[in-house]
Amino acid sequence: MKYKSKKEFLDSVVDNYSDQKEFHQAVEEVIHSIWNTAANNEEYCKFNILDRIVVPDRIIIFRVPWMDDKNNVHVNLGYRIQFNSAIGPYKGGLRFHPSVNLGILKFLAFEQVFKNSLTGLNLGGGKGGSNFDPKGKSDKEIMSFCYAFMNELYRHIGRRTDIPAGDIGVGAKEIGFMFGQYKKIRNAFTGVLTGKGTNWGGSLIRPEATGYGLVYFVVEMMKTRKHSIKGKTVTVSGSGNVAQFACEKLIELGAKPVTLSDSSGFIHDPDGITQEKIEYVKKLKSVRSARISEYAKKYNVEYIKGKRPWSIKCDIALPCATENELNLDDAKELTGNGCYVVAEGANMPSTTDAVHHFINKKILYGPGKAANAGGVAISGIEMSQNSTRIPLSREKVDG
């Protein structure tokens, strides 16, 4: 064995990628789980598997020049990290957000490798995106950027090579712009992107898949203690696709979601978020791109500015916003208030200390790699539908 201890290996990762703290955290989480197996397996040691799984197959970085509505040219960075294709083509989302950098995308791509393998589908892992911020941009500006982004990305993707999808800042609209440009360049209609609209090759239930899958996962977790989700109070962070559709499925199954959040703060609706209110949130976020505080004004509920919802008493907590949104203090507050189920709708939303606290308290904890894999599972179904040209019904996909 090249490394004498787990600490020595993790220290080598930090030394090699000193500025990529999110990547360090993702690697540490996985290594804690597999160290004994990897360190005591002669074949794994001989072929240095540990070093190999933390280094991507390739990292692609490119310039993305685009034009705004005033004919000014802007330049952003584009990335695609093709991390591992041991069991299938690279698969993972594209994120458009000003926080995007190499460290964040490496952590997301690394997580994606294991998440995809847990679905049982033959998919490798990758991730990509740009530091472009779609907020406040017109449709024409977003289209200009997406065309420019695909003008370079098309060289590196394909239905048997790498199949990107959406993520933060990349919904059906952005996927549509990129898919149209890819189709124009290649003169071929192939399943090279997932998350497409249902009128042009997308799958029913794809927008809902991660949120629905998260709740189904919670239901199965609770069965291990012979508990039902019906009547349980649930705190949810975020207000994007995952949070919206998690709430939708919670309502359908008889649970009571009471919070939603965004980067400005959170709302607390103690009477419960209803389907009518979720429809309002969908329009609020996807059409108006407005803040969740508008919900508080419309429904006369409490809005807590600059805070996260983990102080609210609940049975179940679903962090669905972003990485490291739930720290040790939040974890202690949750368990102190009686929360006994935490399932991650976002990627690595809990800090390492928070995860250790959940495990030590013996609550039901569902890590994101498993709990939010519903999205990539339905992406696999979309890929299959694109290959066979046979669409599936909503009931078939949700079943």
Segments and roles (model prediction):
Residues 97, 116-230:
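Glycine/serine-rich phosphate-binding loop and adjoining beta1-alpha1 elements at the start
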Residues 2-26, 221, 335-399:
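Adenosine-phosphate binding glycine-rich loop
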Residues 43-74:
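Structured beta-strand/loop patches that form or line metal/cofactor-binding pockets in enzymes
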Residues 161-165, 188-193, 236, 259-262, ...:
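General beta-strand structural signal in soluble alpha/beta enzymes
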Residues 304-314, 324-341:
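Rossmann-fold NAD(P) dinucleotide-binding segment
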Residues 194-197, 202-313:
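Glycine-rich phosphate/diphosphate-binding loop of Rossmann-like nucleotide-binding domains
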Residues 72-113:
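N-terminal cap/recognition module
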